[in-house]
Swiss-Prot record:
Major subcellular site: nucleus
Keyword Nucleus appears in the UniProt entry: yes
Any one GO molecular-function label of the UniProt entry: DNA binding
Function field: Probably essential for transposable element Tcb2 transposition.
Name of the molecule in the record: Transposable element Tcb2 transposase
Length: 273
């Protein structure tokens, strides 16, 4: 019975104690109590934890991630000095997106077996777009409508490009992920027309993008701060974004070799970053 309890949990870490209790029940044995199930799992080192949410990555993209990480493993802060990292992010007005639990051994939070795979989605919150370089932060841009290629072009033309040219210089290199609207013919033509160089970027690689650390920084500072409407929430986000010190930027750019090495060590699977 004890071995079955542990086996069922290892086969599906998202099973609750109640589910496991029902699965291991047999006609010829006494049904274990929930307390017994939980105790056996804890004895086996399987404690209830919140899973790390990471994207599911295809084999092709894992190979590409490792190749990119190896190519940039020894880049230092100066190598990234003329690069502009970008991304958009969603912040809830209040509440959460829901909490799921899994059982896993200590120290295995980022093991793919114990991660909760996610897909991008929108709705019901404040969406923002931002970018930064090694010398400056751009003005945070609020996204009020559906983020299509035309909205993205407006952001590039009227927010990103003027800021990048004035703070980084004309020879900046722009980073973006491979979202379809970013790679559409319409946007590719904009980059060609405006003579903007792009950083080759592996798909499904938010953990390689240092701007993710900035989104986490903003989230930590606004979490628990109530906003009565979307305008107030955006004001909160903007205040935190503008207050990020350049020492934080230096730190996350210095983390790039570690990010690359971690991706290599993980064979392209999602990492802790």
């Amino acid at each position: 019975m004890d071995r079955n309890i542990v086996r069922v949990s290892r086969e599906d870490p998202q099973r609750s104690s109640t589910d496991i209790q029902m699965v291991v029940k047999t006609p010829n044995e006494v049904t274990p109590s929930l307390r017994t199930v939980r105790r056996r799992l804890q004895d086996a080192g399987l404690h209830g934890r919140r899973p790390a949410k990471k994207p599911s990555i295809s084999k092709k993209n894992r190979i590409a991630r490792v190749a990119w990480a190896r190519a940039h493993l020894h880049w230092g802060r100066q190598d990234w000095a003329n690069h502009v990292f970008s991304d958009e992010s969603k912040f809830n007005l209040f509440g959460t997106d829901g909490i799921k639990w899994i059982r896993r051994p200590v120290g295995c939070r980022f093991d793919p077996s114990y991660q909760l795979q996610t897909v991008k989605h929108g709705g019901g919150s404040v969406m923002v777009w931002g970018c930064f370089s090694g010398t400056s932060m751009d003005p945070l841009r609020r996204i009020d409508s559906i983020m299509d290629r035309f909205v993205y072009e407006d952001i590039l033309e009227n927010t990103m490009r003027p800021w990048a040219r004035s703070t980084v210089g004309r020879a900046f290199v722009f980073q973006q992920d491979n979202d379809p609207k970013h790679t559409s013919k319409h946007i590719k033509e904009w980059f060609r027309r405006r003579h903007v160089d792009l950083l080759d970027w592996p798909s499904q690689s938010p953990d390689l993008n240092p701007i993710e650390h900035l989104w986490e920084h903003v989230e930590r500072h606004v979490r628990g701060v109530r906003a009565s409407n979307a305008n107030q929430k955006f004001d909160q986000l903007q205040d935190v974004w503008q207050a990020i010190p350049m020492s934080v930027i230096d730190t996350i750019l210095d983390s790039m070799p570690r990010r690359c090495q971690t991706v290599i060590d993980a064979k392209g699977f999602p990492t802790k970053y």
